[in-house]
Design a protein with these regions (language model features):
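C-terminal effector/interaction modules appended to NTPase cores
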Residues: 2-171
């Protein structure tokens, strides 16, 4: 029996049998031939269901890939701008190498800039010449080793969030 399905969780919207989807990062369009859930085949599924999708074409889909509607494309870039809460005792400074975990994918990244820290009492931007200290809120810029596809956090917190990991300790 020749079955090739791709399993994952729907992070937003609805997927329907017969719908055209775009596989990212491959950039290949295909059609959803079938949708399977724990209860069997269904015509449509929605967030946050776990599904197995059967696609009409062989496409390069692996851990961390996204299947999206061509009409509602996420952002995609190696240069990211983010608001973060720094939760490590060693200050976060420009040039620091980190691992960025986004959905189910982990990629190497480097902090290119600390734009500012936020004063917790006023939420006003403050200079951060020493970087971000433990529990600081701030805005940073990162460059990743490969493109990340994302939505704004206010739109979709599953695809609009990430965590930074210390490579040597996994902190």
């Amino acid at each position: 029996h020749d079955f090739r399905g791709f399993s994952g969780q729907i992070a937003g919207g609805v997927v329907r049998r017969g719908q055209t989807v775009l596989a990212l990062p491959a950039g290949i369009r295909t059609t959803v031939k079938a949708i399977h859930t724990y209860d069997g085949a269904v015509e449509e599924a929605f967030c946050p269901q776990s599904v197995t999708l059967v696609l009409a074409h062989d496409v390069d889909v692996s851990r961390g890939s996204m299947l999206v509607s061509p009409d509602q494309l996420p952002g995609g870039s190696t240069d990211l701008h983010a608001q973060i809460c720094w939760m490590h005792p060693r200050a976060l400074q420009p040039g620091r190498k980190v691992l960025l975990k986004h959905t189910t994918s982990t990629v190497q990244a480097i902090v290119t800039d600390i734009e500012h820290r936020l004063d917790i009492a006023t939420l006003e931007p403050q200079p951060a010449p020493a970087g971000l200290a433990l529990n600081d809120l701030g805005e940073i810029r990162l460059r990743t080793a490969r493109p990340i596809f994302y939505d704004g956090y206010a739109t979709n917190r599953l695809t609009g969030s990430f965590i930074l990991i210390e490579p040597g300790t996994n902190d």
